[in-house]
Regions:
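Beta-hairpin "wing" of winged helix-turn-helix
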Residues: 53-62, 66-68
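A short alpha-helical element within helix-turn-helix/winged-helix DNA-binding domains
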Residues: 26-36
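Short, hydrophobic-biased segments on the C-terminal half of alpha helices
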Residues: 14, 46-47
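Alpha-helical residues within the helix-turn-helix
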Residues: 33, 50-51
């Protein structure tokens, strides 16, 4: 499994926004510079995250972005799946390759193995949330 560059940038952008004081907006320029993400690419990512319900956008000269919900309620899995779609670790788990790994000897054991591994990874990513960065960032700014 390899995380896409787009997901990596999205995770970094959300991490950045989670460290800001609750009433402060993050501008595209500020996030782009702080996280070293190309501005044009970041704009598309932030739009996707806004459509996905993770961010709120505010127009105008003083506009920007902020989290739409508490950082503790935004998981890494949520961000990855908004950006890249459902997380899949193998052809065996996407529902399109039914029986792809099956043979008469293993009776789907290989397919079951990959499905179990996918559950482990998804559970781990769903337990990782941005609240941990929010606390750290706000502590460092005081």
């Amino acid at each position: 499994m390899k995380l896409s560059r787009k997901s990596d940038y999205a995770l970094r952008a959300v991490r950045h926004l989670s460290t800001l004081p609750k009433d402060q907006l993050g501008s595209i320029n500020t996030i782009s510079e702080a996280e070293r993400v190309p501005r044009e690419f970041l704009a598309k990512i932030l739009k996707d995250l806004t459509r996905g319900g993770v961010l709120k956008s505010f127009q105008g000269v003083t506009g920007g972005y902020k989290l739409a919900k508490p950082a503790k309620d935004v998981s890494f899995l949520n961000i990855i799946e908004i950006i890249d779609g459902p997380l899949r670790v193998s052809l065996a788990t996407d529902g399109k390759a039914k029986g792809f790994y099956n043979d008469s000897k293993n009776e789907g054991a290989f397919e079951k193995f990959w499905k179990d591994q996918e559950k482990v990874i998804k559970n781990s990513l769903s337990r990782q949330h941005f609240g941990r960065f929010a606390l750290r960032g706000r502590r460092n700014s005081n």
